[in-house]
């Protein structure tokens, strides 16, 4: 099993090209099921979860072709299976996003209950309740969600009991081919949801309220393929910016989207970073100074993203002063904390809050990645640790970061993959 070894770094310096967003690419690939003609997705990152999504589409009978240059073509002409099996779904929670498209276009879907990161229950009941309101008959049996609808799904009014990105995406895709108008209230506003909505519009969907908590979808008879470019990955961008801040460096992220990262950029400025942005780039300069501690509290977009929480734990662990990090989205999302403590970090956990007292340097150690973002935080920690840090179980990292060691090497870091 692959590992990463990281040695203490000089301040990171240079330019890094940001990949397409995993969390936008996955639902957009699933949306290919809705299209009656060829659908081409560009700026698709080369990641384990993307490979799994393509395998899932092939399993359903779709034709999936890698066109090179981060472009994938999907054809559903021969799609003739409507079951997403356990052996694929167990490795990736986003597989649940095939449910809405299959049901909307074909009237039937069997989807294994999902797996993926071990960071809390993330219940699928919001997905199922919304589809039931649209007329689907659903039962959960033998580990599978079995959904059927006679004719087309029906437009309806859905109020989400809690903000859920995945449920919003599933219902948005289902509503695009429903009979009548669907209104989703308390919808997720994340940029990845907005990206999916723009993709559906390019396919012929009628959606208003994009970027707000109320989405209105007028169902159409059919959707057609198009070519759509996936948005830049805001979490990858934020991770590299934090790495530069921690190492007191200066980097520029290109092919990025500053507008999707405002809460993170604001906190980096609070930490002492000088931030400069253009239309598609972000530059961070620490002027050689140690970052200052910051308080963060995760919440749905446009507030601070839960997927940047672990990285800011590392920033606070190496900052001047004491910072508080509060997690409100997922339970069990501080699994990186014991590993950081093994590296010498001074962290106290009180429920869903960590109180982090900054120190000047960590110590290299052998640590274990427990989920995707935790693994990124451990790599960043290794950049400011005396000696060598080894991160095990980096298959988590490969689910969400494209060519991460090569990108760090390009910024001057000693990050090496060991087979």
Curated annotation (Swiss-Prot):
InterPro entries: Enolpyruvate_Tfrase_dom, Enolpyruvate_Tfrase_sf, MurA_subfamily, RNA3'P_cycl/enolpyr_Trfase_a/b, UDP_GlcNAc_COvinyl_MurA. The active site is at residue 117. SUPFAM superfamilies: EPT/RTPC-like. Phosphoenolpyruvate binds at residues 22-23. It catalyses: phosphoenolpyruvate + UDP-N-acetyl-alpha-D-glucosamine = UDP-N-acetyl-3-O-(1-carboxyvinyl)-alpha-D-glucosamine + phosphate. Gene3D superfamilies: Enolpyruvate transferase domain. The keyword Cytoplasm applies. The modification 2-(S-cysteinyl)pyruvic acid O-phosphothioketal is found at residue 117. GO terms for cellular component: cytoplasm. Keywords: Cell cycle, Cell division, Cell shape, Cell wall biogenesis/degradation, Cytoplasm, Peptidoglycan synthesis, Pyruvate, Transferase. It comes from the Bacteria. It is found in: Cytoplasm. GO terms for biological process: cell division; cell wall organization; peptidoglycan biosynthetic process; regulation of cell shape; UDP-N-acetylgalactosamine biosynthetic process. It is an enzyme of class 2 (transferase). One of its GO terms (molecular function) is UDP-N-acetylglucosamine 1-carboxyvinyltransferase activity. UDP-N-acetyl-alpha-D-glucosamine binds at residues 93, 307, 329. Belongs to the EPSP synthase family. MurA subfamily. NCBIfam families: murA, PRK09369.1. PANTHER family: UDP-N-ACETYLGLUCOSAMINE 1-CARBOXYVINYLTRANSFERASE. Cell wall formation. Adds enolpyruvyl to UDP-N-acetylglucosamine. This is UDP-N-acetylglucosamine 1-carboxyvinyltransferase. It comes from Shewanella frigidimarina (strain NCIMB 400). The gene is murA.
